[in-house]
Amino acid sequence: MEEKIRIGISTCLLGESVRYDGGHKRDRFVTDTLGQFLEFVPVCPEMECGLGVPRESMRLVGKPESPRLVTNRTKIDHTERMITWARKRVQELEKEDLCGFIFKSRSPSSGMERVRVYNEKGIPEKKGVGMFARIFMEHFPLLPVEEDGRLHDIRLRENFIERIFALKRWRDLVDEKRSRGRLVAFHTQHKLLILSHGHKHSRILGKLVAEAKSISPKQLYPQYQALFMEALKLKTTVKKNINVLQHMMGYFKKQLSADEKQELLETFNQYREGYIPLIVPLTLIKHYVGKYDQPYLKQQVYLNPHPIELKLRNHA
């Protein structure tokens, strides 16, 4: 059985009763769907730093860029306790080989963005970041991160999961002997996936790989990884996907019959207009890639960047 990808996650999202009131926030998509392909490494900042359950609820107070973590009723300041624990915990998480993290939204410890921070008048502003989440993201700047709430947006979900699987493939590459040739092969397989996120990074990464002979693998690999993960963070769009589909069609356009060409172009247009999801023209492309035996296209990760069971390309 293929090894599951490991990602960190806020413990309450797995259904564990660790919230301040003794409850949980189980996310069925995470546990029942993603759980088929991912191994979760749970983290509960409040429990792990010794605050227990049940506990008094807390909030962030002060300036959004440097807030304090304070209990609501008794006004006990747990800032130093949380920061000390968080800095130690991220060091421990380095050993877990994580390929991503799913945070609990709006949490004063784990919210990724738009967390309420209360000013001196007690008025909240949604400009904060959870105390643990901030330290985690600063420590692991290239790691894909998301919140449970944002994962209900299908496009954010697809982008996050695509990056998780891409990082795992990168890690598998790095685990082997580093060489320019292996990096070139990796880039070749990911060319169209990168292009689907934008021309700019496609050009920059292509230039870096073209100059690989003049750079030592020790320098080349970190440079490539940073640019690669930065590229995939950019959202794909219908226009970008159409560009990639047309690019792929160009490899076997002359072999297509008139009817085949018309059918393919019609599916492109229907996808462009929002009548059908990406999976439809992509399935047709895959058919012709096999029928007309296109080795370069067969190796493209863009065709299968994540498990088809997740149905991430089934939305119009």
Provide a role label for each language-model segment.
Residues 2-7:
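Extreme N-terminal starter segment of soluble prokaryotic enzymes
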Residues 10-11, 44, 102-106:
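Short beta-strand segments
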Residues 14-19, 110-111:
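Short glycine-rich His-centered loop
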Residues 17-18, 22, 26-68:
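N-terminal glycine-rich anion-binding loop in soluble enzyme alpha/beta folds
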Residues 89, 93-174:
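Internal, conserved structured core segments that host functional sites
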